[in-house]
Amino acid sequence: MDFESKYCTSQVNGTITITTRKVLDENLKSLLDEGKGELFLSCIPRNHSCSPRWIVEVASELGEVYIMRYKIDFSGNSRGYAYLQYINVDLKESAMQYLPMRFRQLCMCLRVEPSTNNRELVLKNVESSLRPWQVYQEMLKIHPFTIVRVYEYQLDQFFYIFEYRNNDSAASAHQRVRNSIRKFGEHAHISWLTAENILSRASGSFCFQREVSQNRTRRVPPRQKGCFKF
């Protein structure tokens, strides 16, 4: 395979990215960029015996890879995991069977699982003097997001759930917000949204949805109460 003609390799901070050079239909590209068909590869050796290029070359035996994001530490060694997507999202199930077997044949015991594609962050303990609209604007300056839900769990006490386009975007936002967390108060904290449902704290609150593009606000149906939604 002529690797260089098919794939482009780049690095930003702790992520080595290998992306197809193929021009894709915009609708398909949008789905892929939102994490459709994403796989999570783990148990990658932390030395250089299992390079990002090698993984893509093996994965390409099944079909053309759209992107692989390979995580490294400050020394350039693998952090033990990576994310992989095929252009053909229907290959996801086949890949979970084929790739572990193929890696074992090549003496590499990598695990291949569906990616959770976690793309939501929770901002808590924000200074009470900051109103939701101010937090919205400050967060938008740090890193673009697709939507934010704002829950009032006590009078004038809010927590914020930010949704990003995909896991990679959320990870970048997480790091940038941590670096700027003092903007939101001495005790402010940003973390990943987990299965331990934080929304239970919001029962009995109220909810509005702001349509930012039209600069107007409308009340959300009762079943969605408990939040502001920008």
UniProtKB/Swiss-Prot annotation:
Keyword entries, A-Z: Cytoplasm, Differentiation, RNA-binding, Spermatogenesis
Record has RNA-binding as a keyword: yes
UniProt keyword RNA-binding, yes or no: yes
SUPFAM superfamilies listed in its UniProt record: RNA-binding domain, RBD (SSF54928)
One GO location term (cellular component): nucleus
GO BP of this protein: male germline stem cell symmetric division; negative regulation of translation
Knockout mutant characteristics: Viable but males are sterile. Male germline cells are arrested at the transit amplifying stage and over-proliferate. Males display reduced copulation behavior.
Subcellular locations according to the entry: Cytoplasm
Molecular function terms, GO-annotated: mRNA binding; RNA binding
Record-annotated RRM domain positions: 37-128
Known role: RNA binding protein that forms a complex with bam and bgcn, involved in 3'UTR-dependent regulation of a subset of mRNAs. Preferentially binds a long isoform of mei-P26 transcripts. Involved in 3'UTR-dependent post-transcriptional repression of several 3'-RNA processing factors. Involved in promoting germline stem cell lineage differentiation and mitosis-to-meiosis transition. Required for proper transit amplification of spermatogonia.
Oligomer status and interactors: Part of a complex composed of at least tut, bam and bgcn; complex formation does not require RNA. Interacts with bam (via N-terminus); the interaction is direct. Interacts with bgcn; the interaction is indirect and is mediated by bam. As part of the bam-bgcn-tut complex associates with twin; may recruit the CCR4-NOT1 deadenylation complex to mRNA 3'UTRs to mediate post-transcriptional regulation of expression.
Free-text note on domains in this protein's UniProt record: The RRM domain is required for binding mei-P26 mRNA 3'UTR.
Official protein name in the record: Protein tumorous testis
Lineage start: Eukaryota, Metazoa, Ecdysozoa, Arthropoda, Hexapoda
